[in-house]
Amino acid sequence: MNETIQVKIITPSSIAFEKQSKMVTMPGEDGMFGVLPNHVPMIVNLTAGLVQVYINNMHNSENTYLISGGVTEITSNYINIVTEAAINVTNLSESEISTQCYELQKLSSH
């Protein structure tokens, strides 16, 4: 049984993130949800919000991305998150994340 799952965050211009992970949480249309290795296959629509990637343990996320919404394809060994925009907000303060969120909303309304 795999202990990690491959995670990719894909935008039209680049692969914003790609690493093995212990767990990922993301914003679905019905609320936040988490994905662990060996998950059942599914495709989920995503809303704008934070994607948190847990690399070394499931208690502290090491990478956080603000996405503009999109879709994710999940299998037992990989997660592909396809989004129009993804901003790495891992090392930003709460107020800086709010500013980035506002900027992302302006971009997605055009």
From Swiss-Prot:
Any one GO CC term of this protein is: plasma membrane
Extract the GO molecular function terms from the UniProt entry. Answer: ATP binding; proton-transporting ATP synthase activity, rotational mechanism
Is Nucleotide-binding one of the keywords?
no
Q: How does it sit in the membrane?
A: Peripheral membrane protein
Disulfide pattern? none
Compartment(s): Cell inner membrane
Q: What is its main location?
A: membrane
**What is the similarity comment for this entry?**
Belongs to the ATPase epsilon chain family.
Q: What does this protein do?
A: Produces ATP from ADP in the presence of a proton gradient across the membrane.
Q: What protein is this chain from? A: ATP synthase epsilon chain
Instruction: Give the organism the record lists.
Output: Rickettsia typhi (strain ATCC VR-144 / Wilmington)
